[in-house]
Design a protein with these regions (language model features):
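… and, occasionally, acidic/histidine-rich disordered N-termini of signaling adaptors
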Residues: 1-149, 201-215
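C-terminal catalytic subdomain
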Residues: 62, 82, 138-150, 155-215
Length: 215
């Protein structure tokens, strides 16, 4: 789900068919809003899709995205990204996190939620030397009914009328209350809780949420 704070969103999410056994899931947030952010995000989408074809290393894809976008990103802008490659046969996820909010892993067997927090640098800050060294692949396996939740900071930093943030505790509470309903249930519950929390207060940031569930 994507709920833009303005008519033009600075968040980006995508589903990419890599080959018959693999697909890619991307989520990103560009610093800044409006048309400039959307232009950078359109470039990001184009480069990501061109590099994803046939590539099973999420880190390699983001390293190429950074290399191609770095010359065009202003000094006051950057892109936080997470890119996950799903192997349909082995239920393995290869994840790379480029300065993005840590994805959440829900384990159905024991009803626990942990942050998946591998190191990584946001796109557009470094030309490649440091970025390529610190931005690496991280692998995890999903079991039946496990969920991987990707989100932008518009979720945790949503503000109520008093200026208080929604926060990670409320995110986790919403997930635990709805995980038995699957990916759609988590998205519905979390979106409803966010709207109830924010109320009539103007939304100050884009909100994007992706839930991947292993059947």
């Amino acid at each position: 789900v994507n709920i833009p704070a303005r008519h033009v969103s600075g968040d980006y999410y995508d589903y990419i068919g890599i080959d018959e056994e693999h697909c890619g899931i991307a989520i990103a947030d560009v610093s800044g809003k409006g048309v400039p952010a959307s232009l950078i995000m359109a470039m990001c989408r184009s480069v990501l899709r061109s590099q994803a074809a046939g590539q099973h290393s999420a880190a390699r894809v983001l390293q190429q995205v950074n290399a191609q976008l770095f010359p065009d990103i202003r000094e006051d802008m950057f892109i936080s990204m997470a890119y996950a490659i799903l192997d349909r046969n082995s239920s393995t996820v290869t994840l790379c996190r480029a300065g993005h909010d840590a994805p959440l892993l829900y384990r159905a067997k024991d009803r626990t939620i942990t942050k998946v927090n591998p190191p990584g640098m946001a796109v557009g800050i470094d030309s490649g030397g440091v970025f390529n060294r610190v931005t690496n692949d991280f692998s995890l396996s999903l079991e039946s009914d496990d969920c991987l939740i990707l989100y932008t900071d518009g979720v945790t930093e949503a503000l109520d009328r008093q200026g208080a943030e929604f926060g990670m505790e409320n995110v986790i509470r919403s997930i635990l209350a709805s995980a038995s309903e699957g990916a759609a249930g988590i998205i519905t519950k979390l979106t409803d809780d966010l709207r109830a929390f924010v109320g009539a207060h103007p939304q100050h940031d884009d909100i994007t949420l992706i839930v991947i569930r292993k059947k």
